[in-house]
């Protein structure tokens, strides 16, 4: 189940020579309930690529969102991305589960934190 989402964060750097991962500002990690080394999916809004990697904690308040290693080929500075974390939960907990959603501005400062995904009026 979706556990955490950082919505439309801006890539601040891409370091191809780093060993791998995505570095995320500690404040954003805490707001999204993401842990160091946790597996995440990253969706690049600009080019449509999707990747799977793990989180490294960046400096608190830095706004840092850095793609590292091979992941750096999937986006560039200024691209908008969505970072998704997942968890396994029991079937009974699916009835009450609400993901933690973090919204940020262009400098990756938190603008809103909420639980649950609102129905956006899309017909299925």
Swiss-Prot record:
What's one GO-annotated cellular component? cytosol
> May I ask which residue range the UniProt record assigns to the signal sequence?
none
User: Does the keyword section mention Lyase?
Assistant: yes
Alphabetical list of InterPro entries matching this protein: Asp_de-COase-like_dom_sf, Asp_decarbox
Known catalysed reaction(s)? Answer: L-aspartate + H(+) = beta-alanine + CO2
Q: Which residues bind substrate?
A: 53, 69-71
* Pathway stated in the Swiss-Prot or TrEMBL entry: Cofactor biosynthesis; (R)-pantothenate biosynthesis; beta-alanine from L-aspartate: step 1/1
Q: Which cofactor does it need?
A: pyruvate
Q: Where is the active site?
A: 21 (schiff-base intermediate with substrate), 54 (proton donor)
Which BP terms in the Gene Ontology apply to this protein?
A: alanine biosynthetic process; pantothenate biosynthetic process
One annotated GO molecular function is: aspartate 1-decarboxylase activity
Query: What post-translational events are described?
Result: Is synthesized initially as an inactive proenzyme, which is activated by self-cleavage at a specific serine bond to produce a beta-subunit with a hydroxyl group at its C-terminus and an alpha-subunit with a pyruvoyl group at its N-terminus.
UniProt-listed Enzyme Commission number(s) = 4.1.1.11
User: Could you tell me where this protein is found in the cell?
Assistant: Cytoplasm
Query: Which free-text remark accompanies the cofactor?
Result: Binds 1 pyruvoyl group covalently per subunit.
Taxonomically, the superkingdom here is Bacteria
Q: Which residues are reported to carry the modification Pyruvic acid (Ser)?
A: 21
- EC class: lyase
Q: Which UniProt keywords apply?
A: Autocatalytic cleavage, Cytoplasm, Decarboxylase, Lyase, Pantothenate biosynthesis, Pyruvate, Schiff base, Zymogen
Q: Which NCBIfam families match?
A: panD
Subunit annotation: Heterooctamer of four alpha and four beta subunits.
Q: What does this protein do?
A: Catalyzes the pyruvoyl-dependent decarboxylation of aspartate to produce beta-alanine.
The record's family statement is: Belongs to the PanD family.
Q: This protein is called what?
A: Aspartate 1-decarboxylase
The organism named in the record is Dehalococcoides mccartyi (strain CBDB1)
Q: What is the lineage of its organism?
A: Bacteria, Bacillati, Chloroflexota, Dehalococcoidia, Dehalococcoidales
Gene that specifies this protein: panD
């Amino acid at each position: 189940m979706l556990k955490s989402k950082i919505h439309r964060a801006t890539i601040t750097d891409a370091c191809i020579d780093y060993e791998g991962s995505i570095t995320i500002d500690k404040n954003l990690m805490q707001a999204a309930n993401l842990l160091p080394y946790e597996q995440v999916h990253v969706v690049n809004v600009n080019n449509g690529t999707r990747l799977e990697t793990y989180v490294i904690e960046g400096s608190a308040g830095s706004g840092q969102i850095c793609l590292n290693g091979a992941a750096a080929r999937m986006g560039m500075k200024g691209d908008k991305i969505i970072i998704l974390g997942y968890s396994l939960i029991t079937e009974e907990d699916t009835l009450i589960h609400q993901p933690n959603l973090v919204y940020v501005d262009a400098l990756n400062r938190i603008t809103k934190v909420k639980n649950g995904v609102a129905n956006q009026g899309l017909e299925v």
